[in-house]
Each structure stands twice: as C-alpha cells, then as structure tokens.
C-alpha cells in the first residue's frame, strides 16, 4: 500500500469514528427516546447527497477536570451546508450522544463559523438544538461561546432567515439563541425550553411543575408564545422547516422563490357573497375567506395555537409569497389584545425584513377592554402593531370584510398607516365605534327626552347604521380605494399585488427606530 493510500485509509477511519458520535449504545438510546441523531436530522433536512460537513475534526482544548483525556467527536455539534429544494442553507445540529450536546468554546466556534458563512453568502441558517446546556468543565469559555452566538443571532437578524428547532432539552442561557431567531419549532412531548428547571423552581419558590408543563412544546406554542410551530416528531418538524423555507427568500436582498400558479386568476367565488351573517354580532370563520384568496387554498399558519383571535400565516397569491394577518371573528370577536399585539408585530416585521408582501384582512370591533389588559400594558403592546405596519415598506394590501372600529381599525393596516391598496366589501362598517355605542353617545339627550325611548333608539340606530356603518364614508375620503363584490376578492388582490410588484419606498435615515417593547 502506498503512503498516500494508507493516509486515505486513515482518513476514512477517522471520519467513520466521528460519524458514530457517542457510539452505538448512545445512538440506540437516542432512537429509543423517539429522537433522530444529529447526523440523521441533517441528512433528512437537506436534499439527498448535498450535505457538506465543516470542521469535523475540531476538538476542545480544555484540560480541566480530566477533559484533556476526553475525545468528543465533532465537538458534540455537526455543522455544514447543503441544499434545500436546490437552495443553499447552512445548519448546525447538536449531538446529544456526545456529552449530552453540551456547549463549550470550540462547539460554539463551529456554530459561529457556520453563521458567519451564511451571512457572507446570504443563506438561511437552521439550528437543530438538542443540548443539556453549557459544558461546565469549560466554565467562562462556555459562557463566552454562548455570547458569541447571541451576538451573531442579533447582527444577522433581518439579514438571513434564522430558524431554530428544539429537538430535546434547551435550558438556561441556551434558550436565548433560539429566542433571538426568527422562528422556533418544537416537538410535542420531546422538546423542553426553560431558563430554570422544575427542581430549581421547587427549591426557590416551592412550586411543583413537570418539565413538560413548564417548558414543553405546547406550553410555548399556546401559553408563552415563545415558539411558533409544533410538530409530532423529528421528521415532521424537519418537513415543516423545509416547507417554511419555501416561503422565504435566502436573504434580505432577494425575493422569495416563485411557484407556478395553475389557478384561474379571474376566478370568482360566489359563496363569499353569502358568507357574511345578517346579524353583525354573529361570527364566521375567517379561514373561509383566506382559503378563497390564496393559491390552492393552501397556507402555513404561524403561531396557530397562540392568540387565536388573530390569524397569521404564510401563503402564495399568484405563485408569490405573502404574509397574511387577519382577525378571527370566532375567537373574542377578533378583538386585538396584548398577545395579538406581540404576535402581529413580530410576524409583520419578519415579513418586511425578508421582502414578503402583506395582506391584511380586517374584521375588528376594537381593542379588548378590561383591567387585566390595561394593567398588562395593552397600550404598549397594541402600539407594536401600529409601529410594525408603519415601518413596513413591502407592498401592503388591506381588505375590510365587516367591522373596522376605532383605533383597532387604524391599527389593522389602514390607509393612514401606509396601506397601498385598501379594498372593502359592501358589508364593511368603518366607524369610530359600533352603531349601538355611537347612538347612545350622540343621541343620549334625544333618547332620554323621548316619549318612547326604545322606539327612538331603534330609529336613531337605523339612521346611524345607514349613514355611517358602511364603507362609503371612508371611500368618499379616499381611505378606501374601492368597494368590491366579495366574490371578486381573489381577482382584485392578485391585481393589487401585481401592480405593486415594483414598489420602492425609502424611510427617513436613522440609526434604528425605537419600537415600544
């Protein structure tokens, strides 16, 4: 055997050893817990045969507590790049079979290098998190490593899409990297994410809670709002990540990929003409509107389990990605509240950062009243929606289907906040408040002095509804561009986005704005 052949054979053996991670037994244990290994996840994420590993031979340089005698394959994290539907994507995948995926100095450097490369070439970054936390033996070096990652999460925010998947434990300082990214996916019954675990909480506060209750996938998808997507297992999670990437551009200088649209662009949906209940206080399902507007009735909902009174989702209109924000009359009548303020603002800003046009569908009676809401800061949280819409420079199209009352009407991408095109159904009611409330204020004295207060109230209510609870007052002042037949909604929205394709808008020069956080 030649010297070169021997060295090649030696290389192959080293790579085979590295590929085994923590060894067969730990791989079997990982599978037994219902989880894929770090390398299996990457192989499933990328188009077949396209993954290129980086820094497989990197090793730690810690000598504390016998670490100099420990060989940690790939430094317990696999990093590299590959193709997702033919587009370059960078990724890192923590290897729980090697010291529980604990993060040390060189582990962090590998992740940072992948992020830096993604920033240079303009490619999304996917982080597959499965780690017990910091490598305690490396002390401050491990903490510094976390800081290096957090810094890059921040400076690359809005530059390339950053996607986090929590596929196991993620505790302590480790949670802040996913929190700084654009999207967090979690797996039901497998993922946990918390700052302090159940044992620490019990010791400090006396509260008893399980890890799943404290930081499980559904907790963060429905209660805290920290995560945006929940999946049933690793494969489903990675499938969802690939689907999300299809709606996103590779970076902030590009547009999202376009897909062919076989739908008839002039199609009309007569069922929308009959959708609106005669009783303005009766609910309907806003998804019945959305599915008639988007291509193939297909959409990917963002935070479907959190603040259900507002719908946020990615979809395509005429083959092009759009971000949809819509009130859901079936939940809290579609009112805006504290949680919906956070949900809307982050979604709007994410779409704007990555050049995804916004479609807003409005049926909003107002901001949710209540002491809890006021004490919780609904003024500040509601202002986030106003800020996000106002600073967004992507094409903005608004469709008002029914109620558009008061400040909530303004907040839902009204003409005043920079909507490029505002359409309304004839059933739209654009006013300072609902007819009943307005009549009781405007005609209070007339009603009080009337011989028959009930009859007078009804008369004034009918008059106000006819004169003001409609889209025509706003249309007369140019705040609504057109009142349309509901059945033509898709056609008119396609036309609007086509017209706005070349939109260019520059905001005043500034270092950065000061969103009401």
UniProtKB/Swiss-Prot annotation:
The keyword Ubl conjugation does not apply. It holds the Pfam family Carboxyl_trans. InterPro entries: AccD/PCCB (IPR051047), AcCoA_carboxyl_beta (IPR034733), ClpP/crotonase-like_dom_sf (IPR029045), COA_CT_C (IPR011763), COA_CT_N (IPR011762), MemalonylCoA_decase_suA (IPR005783). It is found in: Cell membrane. Its EC number is 7.2.4.3. It catalyses: (S)-methylmalonyl-CoA + Na(+)(in) + H(+)(out) = propanoyl-CoA + Na(+)(out) + CO2. One of its GO terms (biological process) is sodium ion transport. It is an enzyme of class 7 (translocase). Residues 271-513 form the CoA carboxyltransferase C-terminal domain. Residues 4-260 form the CoA carboxyltransferase N-terminal domain. GO terms for cellular component: plasma membrane. SUPFAM superfamilies: ClpP/crotonase (SSF52096). Carboxyltransferase subunit of the sodium ion pump methylmalonyl-CoA decarboxylase, which converts the chemical energy of a decarboxylation reaction into an electrochemical gradient of Na(+) ions across the cytoplasmic membrane, thereby creating a sodium ion motive force that is used for ATP synthesis. The alpha subunit catalyzes the Na(+)-independent carboxyltransfer from methylmalonyl-CoA to the prosthetic biotin group located on the gamma subunit. The methylmalonyl-CoA decarboxylase is composed of four subunits: the carboxyltransferase alpha subunit (MmdA), the tunnel beta subunit (MmdB), the biotin-containing gamma subunit (MmdC) and the delta subunit (MmdD). Belongs to the AccD/PCCB family. This is Methylmalonyl-CoA decarboxylase subunit alpha. It comes from Propionigenium modestum. The lineage of its organism: Bacteria, Fusobacteriati, Fusobacteriota, Fusobacteriia, Fusobacteriales.
């Amino acid at each position: 055997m030649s010297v070169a052949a021997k060295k090649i054979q030696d290389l192959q053996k080293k790579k085979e050893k590295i590929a085994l991670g923590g060894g067969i037994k730990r791989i079997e244990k990982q599978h037994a817990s219902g989880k894929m290994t770090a390398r299996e996840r990457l192989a499933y994420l990328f188009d077949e045969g396209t993954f290129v590993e980086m820094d497989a031979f990197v090793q730690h340089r810690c000598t504390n507590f016998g670490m100099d005698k420990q060989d940690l394959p790939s430094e317990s994290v696999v990093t590299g790049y590959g193709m997702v539907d033919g587009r370059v994507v960078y990724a890192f995948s923590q290897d729980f079979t090697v010291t529980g995926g604990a993060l040390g100095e060189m582990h962090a450097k590998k992740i940072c290098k992948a992020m830096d490369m993604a920033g240079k070439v303009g490619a999304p970054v996917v982080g597959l998190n499965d780690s017990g936390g910091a490598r305690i033996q490396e002390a401050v070096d491990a903490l510094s490593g976390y800081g290096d990652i957090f810094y890059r999460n921040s400076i690359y925010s809005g530059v390339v899409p950053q996607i986090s998947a929590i596929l196991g434990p993620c505790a302590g300082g480790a949670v802040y990297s996913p929190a700084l990214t654009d999207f967090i996916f979690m797996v039901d019954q497998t993922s946990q994410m918390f700052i302090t675990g159940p044992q620490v909480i019990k010791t400090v506060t006396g509260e008893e809670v399980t890890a799943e209750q404290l930081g499980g996938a559904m907790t963060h998808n429905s209660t805290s709002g920290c995560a945006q997507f929940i999946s049933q297992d690793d494969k489903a999670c990675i499938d969802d990540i690939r689907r999300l990437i299809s709606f996103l551009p590779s970076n902030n200088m590009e547009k999202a990929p376009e897909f062919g649209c076989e739908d008839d662009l002039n199609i009309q949906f007569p069922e929308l003409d009959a959708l609106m209940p005669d009783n303005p206080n009766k609910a309907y399902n806003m998804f019945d509107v959305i599915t008639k507007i988007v291509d193939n009735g297909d959409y990917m909902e963002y935070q479907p389990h959190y603040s259900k009174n507002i719908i946020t989702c990615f979809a395509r209109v005429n083959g092009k990605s759009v971000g949809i924000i819509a009130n859901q009359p079936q939940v809290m009548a579609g009112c805006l509240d504290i949680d919906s303020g956070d949900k809307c603002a982050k979604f709007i800003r994410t779409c704007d950062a990555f050049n995804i046009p916004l479609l807003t569908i409005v049926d909003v009676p107002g901001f949710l009243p209540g002491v809890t809401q006021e004490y919780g800061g609904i003024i500040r949280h509601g202002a986030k929606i106003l800020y996000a819409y106002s600073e967004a420079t992507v094409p903005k199209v608004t469709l008002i289907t029914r109620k558009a009352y008061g400040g909530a009407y303004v907040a839902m991408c009204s003409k005043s906040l920079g909507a490029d095109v505002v359409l309304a159904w004839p059933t739209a009611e654009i006013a300072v408040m609902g007819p009943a409330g307005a009549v009781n204020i405007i005609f209070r004295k007339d009603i009080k002095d009337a011989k028959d207060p009930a009859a007078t109230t009804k008369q004034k209510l009918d008059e106000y509804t006819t004169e003001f609870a409609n889209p025509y007052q706003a249309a007369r002042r140019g705040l609504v561009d057109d009142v349309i037949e509901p059945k033509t909604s898709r056609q008119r929205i396609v036309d609007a986005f086509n017209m706005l394709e070349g939109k260019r808008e520059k905001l005043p020069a500034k270092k950065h704005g000061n969103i009401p956080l």
